[in-house]
Structure formats: C-alpha cells, structure tokens
C-alpha cells in the first residue's frame, strides 16, 4: 500500500510537468487471494527449470501459487513496456482482471498483451528484458521458440540463462535469519513470505541507459560477455 510513496517527489514533479498519474484500485483482500498451484503436494513434478533453480540456490525451490480472479491484482513489475505495447505476465503477481483493468485505463492508444506460459512465479524482469527496439533478452530456462510471446515474432532474440549462483552471503542470511523468523511467524498462525527468495535469474534484470548502454550486476560475468558480443557498452 505504501511502497510507491517513496516515489512521490518524482511523481509529483512529473505530474506538475503535464504527465498523467494513474494508480490501480486497492484490493480489499478480505479473502484468500492465493490459490494452490498444484492440486496437492503429490502432484508436484520438478521441471527442468526447477532443477536448474535448485543448482543455483543451494537446493531451494520457488514457492508457487496462483491468484484468484475476485479482484484486480497486479504489481507494476508484472509488465514490460515497448513503446505503445505492454507485455503482461499472468502469474502469482498479476491476474487476468489486472490486465483487463490496465487495458481499460490505457485505452486504444496502448495495447496490453498477456502471457502465462513463460514463468509461473512473480514479476517479468527475470524472464524478459527489452534491450532496444527489435532486440530482446530472454531467459532460456523458461522461454523457448514454442512459448515465446508472439509480440517478439519479428524481434531478434538473445537466449540466456547462465547467471551467477545466488551468493553465499544471501543464502546464509536466508537460512540463519529469514527462515527461523518465518517459522516463528507460522507458529503464531500468520502467513509470511520470509521463506521466499528472489530468483537467481534476477541477475538478468539490467537497466538500459540508452540503446547502446546497460547497467549490469558485476557478478553476472557471462551476461556481460554476451552483451559485449552484441556491441553494448557495459557499466
């Protein structure tokens, strides 16, 4: 509810300069908005992505769930914008109602494209990164030629998945601090996301400064090499 408040000084500056400022409806969440991803625990089958995830995170698996379609639910990181087109990931961080609301607000000037086959968890920025018009970076642990969103049919594609493993310091904090606190919270009868860690592929979440310059995590040496090979300046 209050995360976006940190950006208010910037948003007000934009607003005073003529920008439109819209915000999604706040959900009531007076029900269980999370639905089981699998029918039951016995239905879980590890995918190739799951196995790769375990190797990169010391054996951990992502906790998966789906969102109910009772209210508009989505996070901004669930979308990536390419000019007048937006790609929206239907996932644990955005439901179909969210995509419908976004299209209704943006109107005919923008087109909202949905995908739900490329990533089962939250946010799109560890799966799809648009580097410049006509060139996209795709997480090959999730995206293939078969399930690649149609919006990229005419784009050049860089498939990549060889990110650096989750750091030992991050794993140590998770095991020694977050996990124990999470268990205590569960014992009190509350739910918590303290058991969840960022995907190791969040290392693909670079920042484009312009069409030739990108800011990349210095640990992601393989990604840096790929981008340099494709004539990008790396910061």
Please identify what each model-predicted range represents.
Residues 1-235:
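The feature marks the mature, well-folded catalytic cores of soluble enzymes
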């Amino acid at each position: 509810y209050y995360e976006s408040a940190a950006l208010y000084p910037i948003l007000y500056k934009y607003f005073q300069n003529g920008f439109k400022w819209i915000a999604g409806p706040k959900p009531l969440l007076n029900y269980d908005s999370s639905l089981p991803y699998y029918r039951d625990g016995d239905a879980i089958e590890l995918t190739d992505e799951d196995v790769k995830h375990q190797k990169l995170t010391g054996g951990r698996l992502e906790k998966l769930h789906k969102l109910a379609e009772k209210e508009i639910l989505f996070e901004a990181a669930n979308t990536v914008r390419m000019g007048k087109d937006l790609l929206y990931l239907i996932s644990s961080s955005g439901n179909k109602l969210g995509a419908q609301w976004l299209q209704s607000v943006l109107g005919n000037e923008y087109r909202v494209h949905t995908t739900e086959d490329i990533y089962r968890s939250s946010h799109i920025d560890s799966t799809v990164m648009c580097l410049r018009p006509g060139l996209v970076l795709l997480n090959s642990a999730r995206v293939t030629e078969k399930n690649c969103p149609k919006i990229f049919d005419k784009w050049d594609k860089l498939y990549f998945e060889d990110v650096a493993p989750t750091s030992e310091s991050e794993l140590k904090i998770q095991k020694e601090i977050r996990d124990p606190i999470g268990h205590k919270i569960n014992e009190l009868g509350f739910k918590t996301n303290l058991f969840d860690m960022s995907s190791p592929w969040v290392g693909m979440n670079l920042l484009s400064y312009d069409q030739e310059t990108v800011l990349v995590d210095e640990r992601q040496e393989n990604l840096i090499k790929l981008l340099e090979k494709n004539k990008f300046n790396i910061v």
